[in-house]
């Protein structure tokens, strides 16, 4: 029978009491909801007090006569009460119809028609040979008052036998027609409290009749899984793998692999793009969507309708705050591009910048219109006047923030010192390498690309280093010569890029040699720009900084072409490929092969947030055929082919960790006495110096964590889930690299620690360092043009005379047009923005406290957060050290990209847990 008894619960500062707000209506035949006599109605003390004041006697009569439901009678003689506190996150609802649906949902939950939950014990039921199960109980009652308005809290009570054992899993069935976001369930009895973290969307039973399985927070290895929930552990993993057939639906959480066959459209000649992930164009795998094919040879997937979003598993989708922030960025981008788009339409062409004030006006309210407003009184005049009229309303939308690179010194970008500094402390500080010998040699086929020796000869370099009072031999010996080399990655594409007719752009393959002076400044010595060779010429050109007006301007153009190369490689290789694309297979494999109970899953979970969604959005509108990257960056429609070529020639998992990458580039030397096992060649290398602090903190956390769960090598090799996970990453996720000998083995705790440290570094510190500086450095077009539209004029060229008359006009005419510039600036601003719901690396202790009921593990995360606080203090102190020329100086922005914390917005700082933008 039902027993009325007060039960109080308190978690996260929320006091809960149970309500008797249900009736016999809660058992509807069409759902056959079992309302058990084991479900107790619990009345608060306050309600009892009111009854007593009214002179009413409190009775224990049941609200529902259980004799009506004979199949519900308990077979248990000894029993105990277990209470479930269910926390649900509300959707942000704005429409009137949605509000009505919300109230209806509350009513349905109140009468027991919203959700059913069933406890599964860790103990085996001898009668079934499986884990003991409670009867299903409806989650009922009106929601309880909570401090956080985003959540609703409900309760359910169970009566289970004394020997039921500890609940290890909960089966959740959603009876509503819409999905429910389940935050957590807390199970309490007289002796214990067990947390079941969820943070997951529970599908409607109408979409899938299978109940969802939620496991307790305590992590355990497969071999340690309690017998009662072993079968559920495997069943849950199987449920997310899918069968590789059919189109995925929005409510599903299926993780599977596919090649990049959805970037182009073979039905449109100008949108044909190669499939990435085949022998000719190798690439990491993406998440499978199963959309229908539009062609079979090659097998290309439909891109769907323009506004239709690509599938990602339901729990990977942006939450409302993130989605609204992203939409706001797109809306702002629309307004950013509105005026130059109208100007282009009115003049029937895309307008170049003609003076630097055109660019300066981008950071003021009256952008572009002041230059492009038609003077006639017809339609053009009307539109121009109309736009001027709305400028007052949309000023904040039409105005760009001043990028950090020119905020305090408008002319810093012109100086060679700043050009060199950005190779160490800019948005792309990962390509500079130590120059160990001369001449520099190419690895390309000389029959196709000319002599392998660079034309940056010893004589040229010797002449330049003389200005610093040294010789070339001494400079090499003292490790003062450095190189940024894009020759081999770009030269195979240069002819094709320069032949693009729609939105034409021009490029070279560049090499730049730098000298690191004794006063701590890195300065460019010489630049080599190469075109494909012809029968008449090698087409290799050398430029050095000039001492007269002509060579001074030519040097500026040469540096601009280097920056254009750098911007393309940064975006397509270092940013997209090495963080976004390479991380996607790790996320897919983690969800397919590691149970949510697995300690490695729990460690990686915060570092996977939003990555699949942002990658899907990139395939939809950023890296696709005709997308922003193709429109606004040098490689154009060959962008993803270039990214594939880089994956083929240079990507190695074992070299993606920071120390290994620095050693590979010669920017650090192995030193067992150094804290991270490496010593920097340039101490004032802000990205590397700060990055090693972050790397070391991650490494220490991971090593402690791994040793906590794995005692020896045998525990690693015998973990079937772990071994399947690593095998799948190599053989499915990075299938095109599966036979490479450099893949780390997974036999020891040290192996696992190194693998996990690499992954977490890529998702957090590495992505932060090369992403959140995009607008601070790239928002000023002359500093970092993403493409150039003209080659450097030679004396025999028709453009040379114009260059001599007006070099500034020639320089600005080479930059992206106003529309191209504002397009890419808008994207860079969006990509550099922290969302209000960003989760930062320093906050891991808060995230992980929810996942663990293990004091020692919580201590590890607390120590990690404390270490990051110290690191932030250290970085701030470094940025004030006047001896560190690459961090501080007159008008120079400090290097803050690896500061752990940040407010939301475009800040140029902050390390999120994951690749979330």
Swiss-Prot record:
Residues 1-40 form a transit peptide. The keyword Iron applies. GO terms for biological process: jasmonic acid biosynthetic process; lipid oxidation; oxylipin biosynthetic process; response to wounding. SUPFAM superfamilies: Lipase/lipooxygenase domain (PLAT/LH2 domain), Lipoxigenase. Residues 46-57 have a biased composition (Basic and acidic residues). It is found in: Plastid, Chloroplast. Its EC number is 1.13.11.12. Binds 1 Fe cation per subunit. Pathway: Lipid metabolism; oxylipin biosynthesis. It catalyses: (9Z,12Z)-octadecadienoate + O2 = (13S)-hydroperoxy-(9Z,11E)-octadecadienoate; (9Z,12Z,15Z)-octadecatrienoate + O2 = (13S)-hydroperoxy-(9Z,11E,15Z)-octadecatrienoate. Fe cation binds at residues 575, 580, 767, 771, 917. Residues 98-216 form the PLAT domain. CDD domains: PLAT_LH2. Residues 46-66, 880-904 are annotated as: Disordered. Keywords: Chloroplast, Dioxygenase, Fatty acid biosynthesis, Fatty acid metabolism, Iron, Lipid biosynthesis, Lipid metabolism, Metal-binding, Oxidoreductase, Oxylipin biosynthesis, Plastid, Transit peptide. Its cofactor is Fe cation. One of its GO terms (molecular function) is metal ion binding. Pfam families: Lipoxygenase (PF00305), PLAT (PF01477). Belongs to the lipoxygenase family. Plant lipoxygenases may be involved in a number of diverse aspects of plant physiology including growth and development, pest resistance, and senescence or responses to wounding. Catalyzes the hydroperoxidation of lipids containing a cis,cis-1,4-pentadiene structure. 13S-lipoxygenase that can use linolenic acid as substrates. This is Lipoxygenase 6, chloroplastic.
């Amino acid at each position: 029978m039902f027993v009325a008894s007060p039960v109080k619960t308190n978690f996260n500062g929320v006091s809960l009491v149970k309500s008797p707000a249900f009736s016999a209506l809660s058992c509807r035949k069409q759902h056959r909801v079992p309302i058990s006599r084991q479900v107790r109605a619990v009345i608060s003390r306050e309600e009892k007090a009111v009854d007593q004041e009214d002179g009413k006697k409190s009775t224990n009569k049941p609200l529902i006569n259980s004799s009506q439901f004979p199949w519900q009678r308990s077979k248990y003689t000894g029993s105990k009460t277990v209470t479930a506190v269910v926390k649900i996150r509300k959707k942000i609802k704005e429409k009137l119809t949605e509000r009505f649906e919300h109230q209806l949902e509350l009513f349905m939950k109140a009468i027991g028609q919203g959700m059913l939950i069933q406890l599964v014990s860790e103990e085996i039921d001898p009668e079934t040979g499986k884990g003991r199960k409670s009867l299903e109980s409806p989650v009922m009652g009106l929601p309880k008052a909570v401090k956080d308005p985003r959540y609703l809290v409900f309760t359910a009570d169970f009566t289970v036998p004394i020997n039921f054992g500890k609940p290890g899993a909960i089966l959740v069935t959603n009876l509503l027609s819409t999905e429910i976001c389940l935050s957590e369930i807390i199970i309490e009895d007289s002796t214990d409290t067990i947390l079941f973290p969820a943070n997951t969307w529970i599908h409607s039973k109408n979409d899938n009749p299978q109940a969802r399985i939620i496991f307790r927070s305590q992590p355990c290895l497969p071999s340690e899984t309690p017998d009662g929930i072993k079968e559920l552990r495997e069943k849950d993993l199987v449920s997310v793998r899918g069968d590789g057939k059919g189109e995925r639906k929005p409510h599903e959480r299926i993780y599977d692999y596919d090649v990049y066959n959805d970037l182009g459209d073979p039905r449109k000649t100008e949108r044909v793009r190669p499939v990435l992930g085949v022998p000719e164009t190798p690439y990491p795998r993406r998440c499978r969507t199963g959309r229908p094919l539009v062609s079979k040879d090659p097998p290309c997937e439909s891109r769907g309708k323009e506004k239709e979003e690509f599938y990602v598993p339901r729990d990977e989708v942006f939450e409302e705050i993130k989605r609204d922030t992203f939409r706001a960025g797109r809306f702002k981008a629309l307004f950013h591009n509105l005026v130059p788009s109208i100007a282009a339409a009115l003049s029937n062409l895309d307008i170049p910048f003609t003076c630097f004030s055109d660019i300066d006006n981008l950071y003021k309210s009256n952008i572009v219109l002041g230059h492009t407003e038609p003077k006639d009184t017809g339609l053009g005049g009307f539109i121009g006047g109309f736009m001027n009229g709305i400028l007052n309303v949309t000023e904040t939308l039409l105005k760009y923030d001043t990028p950090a690179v020119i905020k305090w010194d408008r002319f810093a970008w012109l100086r060679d010192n700043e050009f060199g500094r950005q190779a160490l402390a800019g948005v792309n500080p990962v390509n500079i390498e130590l120059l160990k010998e001369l001449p520099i040699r190419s690895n390309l086929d000389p029959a196709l690309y000319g002599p392998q020796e660079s034309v940056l000869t010893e004589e040229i370099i010797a002449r330049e280093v003389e200005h610093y009072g040294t010789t070339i031999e001494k400079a090499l010996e003292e490790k003062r010569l450095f190189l940024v080399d894009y020759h081999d990655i770009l030269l195979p594409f240069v002819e094709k890029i320069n032949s693009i007719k729609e939105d034409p752009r021009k490029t070279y393959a560049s090499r730049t040699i730098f000298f690191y002076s004794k006063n701590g400044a890195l300065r460019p010595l010489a630049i080599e720009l190469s075109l494909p060779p012809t029968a008449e010429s090698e087409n290799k050109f050398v430029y050095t900084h000039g001492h007269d007006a002509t060579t001074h301007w030519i040097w500026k153009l040469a540096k601009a072409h280097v920056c254009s190369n750098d911007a393309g490689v940064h975006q397509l290789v270092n940013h997209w490929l090495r963080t976004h694309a390479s991380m996607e297979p790790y996320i897919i494999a983690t969800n397919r092969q590691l149970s949510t109970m697995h300690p490695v899953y729990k460690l990686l979970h915060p570092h996977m947030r939003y990555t699949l969604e942002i990658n899907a959005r990139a395939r939809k509108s950023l890296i696709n055929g005709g997308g922003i990257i193709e429109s606004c960056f040098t490689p154009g429609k060959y962008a993803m082919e270039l990214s594939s070529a880089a994956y083929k020639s240079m990507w190695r998992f074992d070299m993606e960790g920071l120390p290994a990458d620095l050693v590979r580039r010669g920017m650090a030397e192995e030193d067992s006495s150094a804290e991270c096992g490496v010593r920097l060649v340039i101490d004032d290398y802000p990205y590397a110096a700060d990055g090693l602090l972050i790397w070391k903190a991650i490494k220490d956390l991971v090593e402690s964590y791994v040793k906590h769960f794995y005692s020896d090598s045998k525990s690693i090799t015998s973990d079937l889930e772990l071994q399947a996970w690593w095998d799948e990453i190599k053989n499915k996720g990075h299938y095109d690299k599966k036979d490479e000998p450099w893949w780390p083995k997974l036999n020891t705790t040290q192996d696992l620690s190194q693998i996990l440290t690499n992954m977490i570094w890529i998702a957090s510190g590495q992505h932060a360092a090369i992403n959140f500086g995009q607008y601070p450095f790239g928002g000023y077009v002359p500093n970092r043009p993403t493409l150039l539209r003209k080659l450097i004029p030679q004396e025999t060229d028709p453009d040379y005379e114009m260059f001599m008359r007006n070099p500034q006009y020639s320089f600005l005419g080479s930059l992206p047009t106003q529309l191209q510039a504002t397009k890419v600036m808008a994207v860079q601003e969006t990509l550099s923005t922290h969302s209000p719901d960003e989760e930062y690396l320093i906050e891991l202790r808060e995230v992980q406290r929810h996942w663990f009921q293990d004091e020692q593990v919580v201590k590890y995360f607390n120590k990690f957060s404390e270490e990051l606080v110290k690191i932030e203090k250290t970085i701030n102190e470094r940025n004030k050290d006047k001896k560190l020329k690459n961090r501080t100086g007159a008008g120079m922005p400090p290097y803050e990209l690896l500061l752990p914390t940040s407010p939301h917005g475009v800040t140029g700082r902050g390390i999120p847990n994951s690749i979330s933008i």
